[in-house]
Amino acid sequence: MALEFTLNHLAAASAAVDCLVVGAYADHTLTAAAQALDAASGGRLAALAQRGDLSGKTGATTLLHDLPGVTAPRVLVVGLGEAARFGVPQYLKAVGDAVRALKAGAVRSALFTLSEVAVKDRDAAWAIRQAVIAADHAAYRYTATLGKKKADDAGLAQLAIAGDDAQALAQGQAIAAGVEFARELGNLPPNYCTPAYLAEVGVKFAGEHDGAEAEILDEHQMEALGMGSLLAVARGSANRPRLVVLKWNNGGDAKPYVLVGKGITFDTGGVNLKTQGGIEEMKYDMCGGANVIGTFVAAVKAKLPLNLVVVVPAVENAIDGNAYRPSDVITSMSGKTIEVGNTDAEGRLILCDALTYAQRFEPAALVDVATLTGACMVALGHQTAGLMSKHDDLANELLAAGEQVFDRAWRLPLWDEYQPMLDSTFADVYNIGGRWAGAITAGCFLSRFAEGQRWAHLDIAGVASDEGKRGMATGRPVGLLSQWLLDQAARA
């Protein structure tokens, strides 16, 4: 159940909610709202802090009941850590800590006052917007396939944010909706979230919002366009491919921003079958597609004054007697031929045709997003996405957007010196580059299909989902991409 968000202008002590959320630092210093409650209660918070019953350490939460002079029956004190080190990551963690502490139980409504706490190099609008996004992320529950285990609706349902910037609140709600949309798609099992399902979801959303439209290409239409690379990957699956094209038209005659997202709804590896574990997590191989759709949802709900096109090649990489093989030579939509060195390097084979298709929209910028390589995860871990581009201005825009919302990317080189690693004797290009620099050679491969474009590639293999049996889709980098689009709209 998604949280409902409002703004609050009243003093915390008189707010009629089930719980107030305030903060304390490691040295027992209280935030302004906490100081007001302390004064109203006759110094109760300060006394608790001094005797060690109220911790200001990062991650600590203390729930207090029935403070005198305070209307709300509960006060949640969230530890903020050292005041001198309090910044963006600490603020976002505090939001999540608060919501997780109230996620289940008797509290239905709360007032979050930490949005009034100063965060270095960030303004009040940022604090409100990011509080909404982080709170909604922490409150997310997956219930689609739980059946008899379906979670109940108990727990926090309404969160008032201290502040008065209605636009920031609305933008936060829009981006939070996009993140949640992407996470839900990513978390669905592959027998639910097929290429056809992704297409249906896109059509349904576009049909519900003025200014949005959807076009779905089936395999026959893709064949007519010459998408031999994408269709080769699709050959082994009973779930037939789709090309999902979503358009948001709110920027007049301006050129659109185009996002392309890898939509491999399940990846067996093909003939090069995955044998080293982790195959059960390959439903997340469509998170690039899910996340660009989520970004589309955010842009539409925020009514951003720009034109946006999202292209998702939705394909399942499976195995049957018709599956493509290592050493096959396939012809892409661009006319370039590709020698298949490994059928488990399939993401780039569907993206190359999608990138060629996307150029018909004459993009102001073209960005592809993909869980493309394990090599990127080895290099950068789960903390950051990999970014590759030959366009410094575009790369810097994306990097800055990621830093702004703590959904970060790290730039990797895309030098011409790597390109010979993709040489083939039998085709124009080989689809793998060998043992070394795997994330970079994958980016180099894609760059051959984005020539003449202001293009960037985001490898999100390390950030798209959490690891392990209880891991879930994260929705990254919807935050980065949405902030980038907000920045572009502000400059228009």
Curated annotation (Swiss-Prot):
Task: Return the broad EC class.
Answer: hydrolase
EC numbers on record: 3.4.11.1, 3.4.11.10
Of the GO CC terms on this record, one is: cytoplasm
* InterPro entries per the UniProt record, alphabetical: Leucine_aapep/pepB (IPR011356), Macro_dom-like (IPR043472), Peptidase_M17_C (IPR000819), Peptidase_M17_leu_NH2_pept (IPR023042), Peptidase_M17_N (IPR008283)
Query: Among its keywords, does the record have Metal-binding?
Result: yes
Which biological processes are named by the entry's GO terms? Answer: proteolysis
- Residue positions of the active site: K274, R348
Catalysed reactions listed for this entry: Release of an N-terminal amino acid, Xaa-|-Yaa-, in which Xaa is preferably Leu, but may be other amino acids including Pro although not Arg or Lys, and Yaa may be Pro. Amino acid amides and methyl esters are also readily hydrolyzed, but rates on arylamides are exceedingly low; Release of an N-terminal amino acid, preferentially leucine, but not glutamic or aspartic acids
Q: How is the cofactor bound?
A: Binds 2 manganese ions per subunit.
Binding-site list for Mn(2+) 2: K262, D267, D285, E346
Annotated coiled-coil positions are: none
Q: Which Pfam families match?
A: Peptidase_M17, Peptidase_M17_N
Location relative to the cell: Cytoplasm
Q: Where does Mn(2+) 1 bind?
A: D267, D344, E346
Q: Which UniProt keywords apply?
A: Aminopeptidase, Cytoplasm, Hydrolase, Manganese, Metal-binding, Protease
Q: Which GO terms describe its molecular function?
A: manganese ion binding; metalloaminopeptidase activity
The prosthetic group or cofactor this protein requires is: Mn(2+)
What protein family is recorded? Belongs to the peptidase M17 family.
- Give the protein's biological function: Presumably involved in the processing and regular turnover of intracellular proteins. Catalyzes the removal of unsubstituted N-terminal amino acids from various peptides.
Q: What is this protein called?
A: Probable cytosol aminopeptidase
